[in-house]
Regions:
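Short helix/loop capping segments that flank catalytic or ligand/cofactor-binding pockets
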Residues: 4-7, 78, 138-140, 163
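Short, well-ordered strand-loop elements centered on a beta-strand within folded domains, enriched
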Residues: 8-9, 67-69, 190-194
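Glycine-rich, mobile lid/loop segments that gate access to catalytic sites or pores
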Residues: 26-142
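Residues that cap or initiate secondary-structure elements
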Residues: 2-3, 73, 135, 189
Length: 208
């Protein structure tokens, strides 16, 4: 987008899958089309910077965050443990060509991406993220819950089209008794904990 003229045609020929047309209507054709303007994925760069700072602040409080590419097209990575933080997974994610737990899956995903590129196309994917060590009681009900806050930020990334917490939409095929996360007392610490994590560690907008 260093050459604005490369994007001048977009005022007359909006691209499918981009915000060119709705932005044209909303801003009466006065928006910046160079590089996608303020709808560009380039603007996620400052989010990465803010995220890097936040990760350090959270780690200082014993809270760990880990994410990986869970799926590209029809190729899936090994799942993260949704209850226990595994340092081996983090090291694998940081080491592989793509941030995946399984090196073989990362290789196949890379081939899938390159194949789409060679056909002048693209391919979709899923990112899985886990937060470990978050204290119980963080968040608020209704419109200020943890899900609300996370979703609001996640949808700031232009390509994001869906967010799930815990079992997500798979709950539609489950009974309530299956989806519940029963409580138990840890024999060693005496603390209350859950046996499963179907709710994604959030109930009523508050961390469990």
């Amino acid at each position: 987008n260093t050459r604005s003229k490369d994007y001048s045609e977009l005022r007359r020929k909006p691209r499918p899958g981009h915000a060119d047309f709705p932005a044209r209507v909303k801003y009466h054709n006065m928006h910046d089309v160079a590089g996608g303007g303020h709808f560009s994925g380039r603007l996620t760069a400052p989010l990465c910077i803010a995220g890097g700072i936040a990760l350090q602040a959270l780690e200082a409080r014993g809270i760990k965050v880990m994410a990986h590419v869970a799926q590209i097209g029809g190729i899936s990575d090994l799942p993260m443990d949704d209850m226990v933080y595994r340092e081996a997974d983090r090291k694998a994610i940081q080491t592989n060509d793509l941030p995946c737990i399984d090196a073989a899956a990362a290789g196949r995903m890379r081939e899938e991406i390159l194949a789409a590129r060679d056909e002048l196309d693209s391919i979709g994917g899923i990112v899985e993220c886990g937060i470990y060590g978050l204290p119980t009681g963080i968040g608020d009900p209704m419109f200020d819950g943890i899900e609300n806050r996370i979703a609001q930020i996640a949808f700031g990334i232009p390509a994001v089209k869906g967010v799930e917490f815990g079992m997500g939409f798979a709950v539609a095929a489950m009974r309530g008794s299956e989806n519940n996360d029963p409580y138990r007392i840890d024999a060693e610490t005496g603390e209350i904990e859950v046996e499963s994590n179907n709710a994604g560690g959030i109930l009523g907008g508050i961390s469990t």
